[in-house]
Structure formats: C-alpha cells, structure tokens
Amino acid sequence: MRKLFFFLCTHVPKQRAKFTRIMESCQKKQKLETPTELSDMPDDLIFKIFSFLPFFKEDLATRFISEYGKGLWNPDPNAIFDDESLDMTCMSFVYGSLMSKDAQILDSLHLKLRKYYIASDINFLVQLGVNRSMRELRIDFFGKTLELPCCLSTCTTLKVLVLDHLNIMSVPGWFRLPSVETLQLSSVTGGSNYVPSLIRLCSVHERLVVDQNRNKDLVNINVPTLRSLSIDNKRRGHVPLGSFWINVPSLMFLNIKDTFQTIFESMPAMIKANIEVAHDQSQSVKFIESLTSTRHLCLCSPTSENPYPNGTKFSNLVHLKLCTCSAGWQNLLACMLNDAPNLRSLTLKLRQKSDVNPKKVWEKPTVVPECLSTRLEILKWRDYEGTEHEKDMVGYILANATFLQRATFSTKDRNQCDSRFSELQSMERVSEICEFVFD
C-alpha cells in the first residue's frame, strides 16, 4: 500500500493533500497499524480514490469495483487505452492495474490519445504499464507534441517502443531507454536531430524502424549495436521528406523503400537486404558496393551503364531477387551474374509496369559467368511478358545454367499463357534435369 500511496501522490500531484487525508482517515477508522492493499479497502473508499484519478467515469468505476469484488476481472496482457471511447476495457486497465496485488505482466500497452493532456496524465498511464513490467509500448498522439514520459527512463523491462504521428521538440540529456531493443518512429517530426537524439537513448538498440522522415534533413543513422534497419520513406501525397545517411557496420538486416537520395556506407556484416529506391543511385558509388557481403538481396533500383565499380564481388550472395521495371535491369543483372560466383537462386519480378524500354540490347558476355556454369539451381520469373529483351535473357540463362533444377514462370496476361509457355519450353537448355513450372 505504501507503493500505491506514493504512486498516486507522485503521478496525480494535484490531489496529494486529499489522498493524504483519505489515507489517514482510513487508518483511524480501520484501526490498522500498517496500511492495507487497495483491494482490501471498503468499496466506497476505493471509489473515492478512483474519483481523483485522470479519466474518471463514475459508472465505469462502480461497475469495475463490483466485478472485481466478485472475481470477474481478468487482466488483459495486451491493453489498449483509446480516449475516443474510454469504455470499460480502457478503464479496467487503469483500475485493475491499481487494484491487483500481483497484476499479470503486460505484454503490450497501446495508447491512442487524441485529446490534449498534460505530461503528468500521460506519465500516469505509462507508469501503470511500467509497474506491470511492460514489454512493448505504442503511443499514437495524432500530430501533437509529446514530452517523453519520465518513468520510461527507469523501466528495465521495455523492449519495444513505437511512437506514431507525433512531434518531439527536445529530448532531455538525462533521459535514457535502458532496455529498449526496438525503436519504431512512424510519421514523427521534431528538431533537426530528433532521430539521432532518440537513437542515443537506447543503450542496447538492435532494431530501428522509420516510417517517413518528415524533417527534410539528412538523418545520420550511426548505431554500433544496430542489427536490423527498416525505412519506408516513400512519398505519400505532397508531404516533403528528408533523406538518410546509413553508417552501421554491424547491420545484418536492411529493408528500405525510398524516393529520396540515401547515402550508404560499408556494411560488412550484412546478411539480408531488401531495397527499393526510385532514384538513380549511380552517383553514390557506395550504394550497391556497400551490399557485397549480403547472402540474400532483393533489389529494385534505376541503374546506369556502370551500376557499381569494376572489381566489386558478391562472393557471399546466394539468393538474388531483381526488379525488371527499370531501363537498366538487363545491364545490372549481367553485372551481378558475373560478380556473384556462388549464386544459387535467381528471381526476376516486375514490381510495376513501366513504359520505359531497356536502354539498349543486352550484349552477351564472351565468358559464361561462373554462377551459371557451376552454381545456379533455381530460376523464378514473375510477371513474365515475353518481350524480346526478356526472351533474350531467359534464353541465355537456360542455355548456360548447367545445374539448373527448376525454372518457374508466371504471367498476368492469361490470354497469352499458352503461347508464352510453349515458346519457353522450346528454348534450348543445357541442364537435363531442369523442371519447367508454369503458375
């Protein structure tokens, strides 16, 4: 009870004097030597305490006290507090977290706060989660400015923090997120350095998710402990967006969708990368070159005649997915086949139809790439259209992939299925064990 009393006085400071008088009166009436738990108090006293809390509703408080007394309340490990409704589900989280002596560990808490609140009210809600060893917290603030709840700086159980549609003007120098491993920022705005400021709060940060950089500034992502990075920075409407500078040597997993220029530094620990960019990265020589260590690469990008420096090798690359919507896809594929000697699986896919034709007819290399003659086993071609450039490329692969085991093709134009697939089956193929599959 001492902890509860301290919590109420601290997080609802305006009612401190009233709480003190109530607790003193309770102890005199009950003639108790030590304070009891809140759940051991009379219903009318519990109701009076609840009446001083933020978000109080008389009918819901009465109903909850009755249900709790009958043993009908069961804690929800995934709590949602939505101030648009403030129904029994919302208030059960508040009242139950205060009443229960050993409330169940909270797997997640989702706060949807549309109205304006002072910082202490938000801190009150978050502290309820902290007291229940909260693992994940999501705050949707609907465009308002958020002062980070100070109680988070002492929370050692929080693993995932999601901030959605809010503004952060400043982060106190003393503030920390000691146990947060995953930080997700969705439509968050703030000062010029708000992203680096938030990143620095996480001492064990392993995963970062950023959905739209609305600050129009270059965001430097430089986190020694970061293992996974996901960025969705595609323009939606006319909202101006900024760009990123990715400098994370320890990064193992990268997922990025970007319509703006991104600067890539070396990522020697990379295992899997999924990259979709809508601008030509040819001026950034470190773009594809920074991905040379990856084993799984999915790439959709406009390219130039020289997509990366000569001599670049993708020795670890085993699985490659390449988009065929850009004018330079044949040139990029030819280069990567030549520079990925251990490639075993190749998938070609048309993400979005383009009216732009390849810049020029692909010139077959004089020397067969090592991966075709010794490694490639799986070929998948999604949304195959049967253009001259596609037929030219697939014909070359089938004629030189000695160990190809399966070639799978699909097309969106069902009227042309039979003719296209018949044409593919008639092509020369060097592998005697290759199986053709048409979906």
UniProtKB/Swiss-Prot annotation:
Ranges for the LRR repeats: 155-177, 223-246
InterPro entries referenced in this protein's UniProt entry, alphabetically: FBD (IPR006566), FBL13/AtMIF1-like (IPR050232), LRR_dom_sf (IPR032675)
UniProt keyword annotation of Repeat present: yes
Pfam families: FBD
Keywords of the record: Leucine-rich repeat, Repeat
SUPFAM superfamilies found in the cross-reference section: L domain-like
Protein name: F-box/FBD/LRR-repeat protein At5g56570
F-box domain ranges (all copies): 35-81
FBD domain residues: 361-411
